[in-house]
């Protein structure tokens, strides 16, 4: 799929066209029609998954941090290919556990441990090197501003459209809200980083830049 690099109205329309082309390929390859009912059910399910993942990240704002960055990253990496309902259930169960840890004052590192935000390139399995380096050096990773982090779950897809065209437009609009590094100009990403630094009370930011990405 050809991802637009700007967010003008014509870029949104271009992305709508890409989604429609992808839908046609999926239907031809699988022999299954993508109906409004099926698309609505999938949208609702994936919105629930986003909310569950967001609950876990909200817990990471606590000090002491109730979960290591490496464990949180593994959850996000698995979310890309796990069954969506199972992922939602397990993420909510994890959030329940983390909320109890916060209430009990339990953390993976002492309160006051330096808090790091990783930004930039997504980190796919088995890429845990940056988290390992940070967390074996006396700090804790509390947030990832990348596609295996906040970009994956921020912003819900509008569930109100009842026809396929409206649903595809809702999908396009949701994904265009992401401030991916491929967009230009990209002041929105700077705003996101500043917001996340405040929300997660970070002491430092490390920008991860995967060569050739």
Where are these regions (language model features)?
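Trp/Phe/Arg-rich N-terminal binding region typifying the photolyase-homology
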Residues: 1-36, 143, 147-148, 153-213
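A charged, amphipathic alpha-helical module
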Residues: 16, 24-153, 159, 186
């Amino acid at each position: 799929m050809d991802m637009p690099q700007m967010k003008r109205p014509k870029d949104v329309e271009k992305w709508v066209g890409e989604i429609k082309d992808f839908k046609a390929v999926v239907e031809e390859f699988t022999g299954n029609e993508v109906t409004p009912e099926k698309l609505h059910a999938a949208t609702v399910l994936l919105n629930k998954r986003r909310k569950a993942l967001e609950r876990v990240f909200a817990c990471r704002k606590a000090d002491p941090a109730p979960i290591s960055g490496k464990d949180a990253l593994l959850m996000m990496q698995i979310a890309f290919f796990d069954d969506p309902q199972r992922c939602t259930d397990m993420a909510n169960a994890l959030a329940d556990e983390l909320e109890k840890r916060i209430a009990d004052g339990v953390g993976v590192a002492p309160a006051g441990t330096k808090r790091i935000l990783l930004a930039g390139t997504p980190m796919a399995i088995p890429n845990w090197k940056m988290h390992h380096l940070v967390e074996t050096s006396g700090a804790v990773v509390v947030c990832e501003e990348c596609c295996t982090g906040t970009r994956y779950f921020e912003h819900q897809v509008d569930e109100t459209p009842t026809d396929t065209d409206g649903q595809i437009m809702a999908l396009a609009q949701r994904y265009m809200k992401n401030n991916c590094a491929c967009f230009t100009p990209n002041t929105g990403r700077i705003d996101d980083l500043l917001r996340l630094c405040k929300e997660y009370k970070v002491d430092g930011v490390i920008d991860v830049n995967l060569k050739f990405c």
